[in-house]
Amino acid sequence: MIIYRKNFYFIFLFFIASLSYGDAHGDRSIKLEGVENDQTYSSPIKLNFIVENMKVRPAGVMEENSGHHHLLINLNELPDMTKPLPMTKNIRHFGKGQESTSLELKPGKYTIQLLFADHNHTPHKIPLITKKITFFIK
């Protein structure tokens, strides 16, 4: 009986702690529309960037709970999430606050992720990033 009670308290405390963690992140989310995993498309592809419970603002505009989108294309490893994202052919910045784009891609296999970062291109403490999507261009 004592073991059962200890397990119950442990589970209860874990549950309460997980709620606190969830509140710290809130119900913020990010979504990339226009491509799905393991599908084939013709170029150009039209992508829509959706973020919930955050404000989309241009780079340089410092405002709480805001930022802008970045596309990570064909990255094997994520960049350092504690520093501003570099601007490369594989890390595309949408610093004007764009919420969609059209990508002209050559035939082949691609991976893509959407990442929401602050006014300085630095990912938020709890990064808003989509899962990696693999797709093909014919």
Give names to the regions the model predicted:
Residues V61-H69, I129:
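Short coil-to-beta strand junction motifs in C2/discoidin
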Residues D23-S42:
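Short, compositionally biased P/S/T/A/G/V-rich stretches that sit at domain boundaries
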Residues L85-H119:
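Short, solvent-exposed, Trp/other aromatic-anchored flexible loops in extracytoplasmic proteins
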Residues K125-K138:
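Short beta-strand elements
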Residues I50-V61:
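Short amphipathic, basic-aromatic surface patches that mediate peripheral association
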Residues L78-D80, A117-K125:
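Short acidic/polar inter-strand loop motif in beta-rich domains
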Residues K6-I16:
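Sec-dependent N-terminal signal peptides
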Residues I16-G22:
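N-terminal signal peptide c-region/cleavage motif recognized by signal peptidases
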